[in-house]
C-alpha cells in the first residue's frame, strides 16, 4: 500500500510540533519573590541564593526590612533580618523553600510564614562558619490577627 506525500508531511509536522511543545509540558514559571533586607547582611544574601537555587525568581531591595515587615502584617515580635513577599503572602526570616512551596500549594488563610530571629542551621544560617551546627527552630504560620501556630518544626 503506497504512502501518500500529504499524509507523510502531516505526520512529520505533527511530530515536530509535539517535540517543540515537549519542553513546556511540566515546566513551571519561576515563582516571584520580593525580598527586603539590609545591604550588608550576608545571611540574607545566602537565603536569596538558596531560593534561586530552588527555582524561585528573586528581586532584592537593599533598604532594610522594617517598613516591609510592618506593611505586610508580620508582628514585630516575630521579626528577623529580612522580609519577603510571595503571591500575597509574607515571609519573615530564614523560611525554607520547601515550606514556601507548601504554603503556596495549601493556600491557608494567613498573613504568611515566619522564622523569628536567626536560628543557626536554618537556610542562609547554615554556612561553613557554623561548623555544621543546627539549632532546632520552628516555621510559624502567622494568622491575620497576629497569632501564630507551628507550620513545621525542625529538630
Residue ranges and their predicted role:
Residues 5-7, 70-77:
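Short low-complexity, flexible loop/linker segments enriched in glycine and/or proline
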Residues 32-33, 57, 87-90:
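Short active-site oxyanion
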Residues 58-68, 78, 86:
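Thiol-based oxidoreductase modules, predominantly thioredoxin-like and allied folds used
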Residues 31-46:
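Local sequence-structure signature of Cys/Sec-based thiol-disulfide redox active-site neighborhoods
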Residues 40, 47, 64, 96-100:
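Stable alpha-helical elements in mature extracytoplasmic
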Residues 1-7, 11, 15-25:
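N-terminal secretory signal peptides
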Residues 77-155:
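Thiol/selenol-based redox catalytic cores and closely related redox-interacting motifs
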Amino acid at each position: 500500500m503506497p504512502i501518500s506525500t500529504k499524509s507523510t508531511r502531516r505526520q512529520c509536522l505533527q511530530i515536530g510540533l509535539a517535540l517543540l511543545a515537549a519542553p513546556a509540558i511540566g515546566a513551571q514559571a519561576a515563582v516571584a519573590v520580593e525580598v527586603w533586607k539590609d545591604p550588608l547582611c550576608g545571611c540574607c544574601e545566602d537565603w536569596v541564593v538558596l531560593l534561586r537555587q530552588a527555582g524561585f525568581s528573586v528581586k532584592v531591595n537593599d533598604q532594610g526590612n522594617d517598613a516591609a515587615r510592618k506593611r505586610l502584617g508580620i508582628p514585630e515580635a516575630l521579626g528577623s533580618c529580612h522580609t519577603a513577599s510571595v503571591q500575597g503572602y509574607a515571609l519573615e526570616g530564614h523560611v525554607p523553600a520547601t515550606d514556601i512551596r507548601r504554603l503556596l500549594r495549601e493556600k491557608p488563610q494567613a498573613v504568611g510564614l515566619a522564622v523569628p530571629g536567626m536560628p543557626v542551621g536554618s537556610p542562609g544560617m547554615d554556612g561553613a562558619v557554623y561548623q555544621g551546627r543546627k539549632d532546632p527552630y520552628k516555621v510559624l504560620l502567622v494568622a491575620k490577627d497576629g497569632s501564630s501556630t507551628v507550620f513545621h518544626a525542625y529538630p
